[in-house]
Regions:
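Carbohydrate-interacting regions of secretory-pathway proteins
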Residues: 18-226
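Sec-dependent N-terminal signal peptides
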Residues: 4-13
Length: 226
């Protein structure tokens, strides 16, 4: 019995150590909320644009539409400090992202979506991509991560499902892709203007002679932090 218990302890400690080695701590199910039921878009509302969003095969599937500006499928609930995890797969030619603590201009339902956005993009044909870095969508600031800290990387696997982990705590936003830490940003200004808000799944606008392209999300879950 002692040998069995010792073996179980070793395996458990090994799993935790491996998670830490990849830049993430082992997560616990307590406190987590699934934001997508796998069948419907209940709890989500589209803002801006005319891209299409459907619940399909256990995913939220977004498809571009010619002539449409950026489109966002937004959570009906707002969040302040939280940890968000999801899996995403995107066409190599499409840029996407997830809005964090976002708002609409003037608080109007049809106002322009704005706020910090975690970038989603493939690395195909490049020396690396900028997925995981934080952009100031419609804030007038462009990238919130300084140029000298926005190093292209290949943590994103083109054409495959990629796991994102995002932690927003006060003015600090941290992101991981497939267990690799990508971004550790502290931005007091964006936190002052956007201390809480909705999440948004972006389908980026495309040129008239391009597409259609698609992006899909699944296993979307969130834990509010205190």
């Amino acid at each position: 019995m002692k040998k069995i218990l010792s073996l179980v302890t070793i395996v458990a400690l090994s799993s935790i150590a491996q998670a830490d080695h990849h830049g993430e701590k082992a997560t616990q199910p307590v406190g987590w909320t699934n934001l997508f039921d796998g069948k419907t878009l209940k709890g989500w509302t589209q803002k801006n644009g005319t891209a299409t969003y459907v619940a399909k095969d256990g995913t939220i599937h977004g498809t571009t539409k010619k002539g449409s500006p950026n489109s966002f499928l937004c959570s009906d609930k707002e969040y302040g400090d939280f940890e968000l995890q999801f899996d995403v797969k995107v066409d190599n030619a499409l840029n996407s992202g997830v809005q964090l603590r976002s708002q609409t201009h003037g608080g109007k339902p049809d106002g322009r979506v704005n706020g910090p956005q975690c970038e989603i993009e493939a690395t195909s044909g490049k020396g690396g991509g900028e997925g995981g870095y934080i952009y100031g969508e419609a804030t007038g600031r462009g990238w919130l991560v300084p140029n000298d800290k926005r190093t292209p990387h290949k943590h994103f696997k083109d054409g495959e499902w990629n796991h994102y982990r995002i932690v927003c705590k006060g003015p600090r936003i941290q992101t991981w892709i497939n267990g690799q830490l990508v971004c550790d940003l502290t931005d007091e200004a964006i936190y002052k203007s956007h201390p809480k808000g909705f999440l948004g799944l972006q389908v980026h606008g495309i040129g008239k002679n391009k597409g259609p392209f698609s992006v899909a999300w699944k296993n979307i879950k969130l834990k509010e932090l205190k």
